Amino acid sequence: MATFSKLSERKRSTFIKYSREIRQSVQYDREAQIVKFNYHLKRPHELKDVLDKTFAPIVFEVSSTKKVESMVELAAKMDKVEGKGGHNAVAEEITKIVRADDIWTLLSGVEVTIQKRAFKRSLRAELKYVLITSFFNCSRHSDLKNADPTKFELVKNRYLNRVLRVLVCETKTRKPRYIYFFPVNKKTDPLIALHDLFSEAEPVPKSRASHQKTDQEWQMLRDSLLTNYDRFIATHAKQAVFGIKHGPKSHLGRHLMSSYLSHTNHGQWVSPFGNWSAGKDTVESNVARAKYVHIQADIPDELFAFLSQYYIQTPSGDFELIDSSEQPTTFINNLSTQEDISKSYGTWTQVVGQDVLEYVHSYAMGKLGIRK
């Protein structure tokens, strides 16, 4: 019996779309024993050959719905990609941003745009959360969305005392990873983004396909936010990198972080932190490689020291405070009360652990300077 070539994974939505094409086009001639249908495939004759051998004497006629482009059309498309869009343009623009040390300017600029243009407070908090957390975790939007808010925990850190992390079980390759939150000596701060999300939005009941079995009851973000975010950035953000046709919007953070770490001679941290699969320990390209997998790996304390902007790496490789008067634990001197936390975070208090909410709220009140 004939066998198919190695199977490849497809998104559920893609599978449903292709199945619909078959159902809507299938025809069967009983007398001639011929089955006809359309399918989204570049080389339908390969599928036909396998089906003919497998189900003989039935003969299959498979027509492709995939558009066949002429050489003229392909040449025109390549000219367009070379001139304005594509991975090369994205790589060049991100390299420019990283080398000019404009990452913080870009992030704060987009944050200001969100503050001015997103009029609904919950949407404003969600958009900022995606912008900031995707960068500081070199993360996909889907990982941010699928994080389980009941799985937050505080872990010890040699330089920052403690960092916060939340577990993501449902990832692209079904291998768990963590999303991290830690003090950053900039206005763009993942802990403040998390505080704003807790304050303005609500936990979302876990969405699942009918075939999925999971005990997870909640997720951090709503499913439709990816579309909202990409549309908002495309409409309102004026930075050059967002003007590239088919360029990254919600995925920009992971490209920026991978390039930032590589440019600052910390490329060995890209794969374990961002879960990139590059075939090497170090990602050399400024835009991380196309293959992307999740791996559970211990993230070194030094990475968070570097990203916090409180520390600088010495020639010997150690990390020391940039300014001894500025400590990453400065803003958690006074703990928030249960009443303050409940008033600020509402429904999240029923989902997230008390110690986690206390840490986030205390930090935010201290850094934002609004503690009584």
UniProtKB/Swiss-Prot annotation:
Gene3D superfamilies listed in its UniProt record: Intergrase catalytic core
Domain Tyr recombinase Flp-type: 85-367
Alphabetized GO MF terms: DNA binding
Tagged with keyword Lipid biosynthesis: no
Alphabetical keyword list: DNA integration, DNA recombination, Plasmid
SUPFAM superfamilies: DNA breaking-rejoining enzymes
Active site, renumbered: Y292 (o-(3'-phospho-dna)-tyrosine intermediate)
BP term (GO), one: DNA recombination
Pfam families: Flp_C, Flp_N
Family: Belongs to the 'phage' integrase family.
Protein purpose: Catalyzes the recombination between the large inverted repetitions of the plasmid.
Protein name in UniProt: Recombinase Flp protein
